[in-house]
Amino acid sequence: MKKIVLIIAFIFSGMPHTNGQEKETYTLIVKISGLKSNKGHILAGVYNSEIGFLKNEYKGDVVEIKEKRATIIFKNIDAGEYAVSFIHDENKNNKMDTNFFGIPKEDYGCSNNAKSFLGPPKYEDAKFMLSENKTMLIEL
């Protein structure tokens, strides 16, 4: 009897432990179209809070442009509220170039195609809920 208990314990000790509390994560695919050129690359970020929007991304990526389009795939994102932004970094200096007045020289965009008005787009206009895998289209 002791042998059987030891064998069963040995078998179960090699099995992965799950507590039923694992969070499900999702994939967010962002497809950008309407870019002016294939020059440079796209700097994209996912933000999970209004505080730090456009400054401190939750997840980020850099992708190449093909046929004036780009696709960014963000994996392993928890369910919740997010916003996406990107810039078309034409000269690959990894920042948004602006003129003397602070107006962007390079194209940019946000989720929900949120627009800027006398300043950057607002988190409130760009936010969306993620509760399943999602594909988002952003057109310039």
Identify the residue ranges that each predicted region occupies.
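Bacterial Sec-dependent N-terminal signal peptides
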Residues: 1-25
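A short, amphipathic beta-strand motif
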Residues: 26-34
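Surface-exposed loops/turns
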Residues: 37, 78-79
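Short, ordered, surface-exposed loop/turn motifs in non-cytosolic proteins
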Residues: 37-45, 50-52
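Exposed aromatic-hydrophobic patches
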Residues: 70-76
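A short tyrosine-centered beta-strand micro-motif
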Residues: 82-86
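Acidic, glycine-anchored loop motifs typical of Ca2+
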Residues: 90-97
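Extracellular beta-sheet/turn segments enriched in Thr/Pro/Gly and aliphatic residues
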Residues: 105-140
